[in-house]
């Protein structure tokens, strides 16, 4: 019997890097709502009392970047100076310019179907049948713990919690399947007057126990709740935040490889984002079709070129079909040119801010999470 441990982490919506991601995607969504063909590469930096929004944007639309940044910070929960950050009073600096014409000439074409990739790069998509959402268990439950922290903070159950938090879960795998949770780490920002005893009991009862499946938790499971003790100073006062610094949290928690490109703040002409979504869509449908228990798909592109420069598939010995058979199947059923995948997933619309916290994958309301191709794939193999 093969037995090993695997660990993934997540962070809350109030983590500094996630504040930056959400502001970048708030700007993107506001622009796409008015101009679906806009070219957006929006980067954000946050630190005590300051938000800096920069990047390259080409659009016919006007949006109030300052108001979008402030509202995003307030929606996350930073509304008072005693939290170290206040959306109403922080400085917002705007350093946005236009997209380079050199890039634009490689993307836009007279025939839209010949739209070139916005950059070179390699992207990965992954799926596994170990959870109902066809995602790895460690990242799935690390996200759910963080979502529960946000829920009890906002609904008043634990109103002394603050927005900044992190989780980390270590799972025991036997023969490639999760069988138990070995370790849970949860650190959450809190109000200054809360004792560690009160915090640890409340976090265990209100956050951890309601989320983790009972069959995976035992007397051997270790829990580390705020293991350093006091966590009052957090958010941008504790650390600066930057768009695109949580790419493993955003994807598969380290279970799959990553091409290196971040997602937030980028319109769908940027294959860093759109092709990673398409790769997840393909991998998930292959697993949903029963053609593999695990599947990792890699796609690569050249700037200005429509067709992918490569497609490869690894099923880790869980498929009865060869890589060549599966790639041929993918080519028949999925158009992975930039124009094709944007059309296939209907990506030129304001759907991105919701992805900027708690992961871009494993959420059934998103187009790249649908398994509508599974039956056709199964019938055609």
Curated annotation (Swiss-Prot):
UniProt keyword terms in alphabetical order: ATP-binding, Cytoplasm, Magnesium, Metal-binding, Nucleotide-binding, One-carbon metabolism, Potassium, Transferase
**Residues the entry annotates as binding Mg(2+):** 17
Which residue windows are coiled coil? none
Task: Write out the annotated subcellular location.
Answer: Cytoplasm
Q: In which pathway does it act?
A: Amino-acid biosynthesis; S-adenosyl-L-methionine biosynthesis; S-adenosyl-L-methionine from L-methionine: step 1/1
Q: How is the cofactor bound?
A: Binds 2 divalent ions per subunit.
Q: Which Pfam families match?
A: S-AdoMet_synt_C (PF02773), S-AdoMet_synt_M (PF02772), S-AdoMet_synt_N (PF00438)
**Molecular function (Gene Ontology), one example:** ATP binding
Q: Which cofactor does it need?
A: Mg(2+); K(+)
Which residues are listed for ATP binding in this entry? 15, 164-166, 230-231, 239, 245-246, 262, 266
Q: Where does L-methionine bind?
A: 56, 99, 239, 270
Q: Name one GO biological process term.
A: one-carbon metabolic process
Looking at the record's lineage, which domain of life comes first? Bacteria
Q: Reaction catalysed? A: L-methionine + ATP + H2O = S-adenosyl-L-methionine + phosphate + diphosphate
Recorded GO cellular component terms are: cytoplasm
Q: Does the keyword Nucleus apply?
A: no
**Which Enzyme Commission numbers does its entry carry?**
2.5.1.6
Reply yes or no: does the keyword Protease apply: no
| SUPFAM superfamilies documented for this protein | S-adenosylmethionine synthetase
Family the UniProt entry places it in: Belongs to the AdoMet synthase family.
Q: What is the role of this chain?
A: Catalyzes the formation of S-adenosylmethionine (AdoMet) from methionine and ATP. The overall synthetic reaction is composed of two sequential steps, AdoMet formation and the subsequent tripolyphosphate hydrolysis which occurs prior to release of AdoMet from the enzyme.
Read off the PANTHER family from this record.
Answer: S-ADENOSYLMETHIONINE SYNTHETASE
Protein name per the record: S-adenosylmethionine synthase
Q: Which organism is it from?
A: Idiomarina loihiensis (strain ATCC BAA-735 / DSM 15497 / L2-TR)
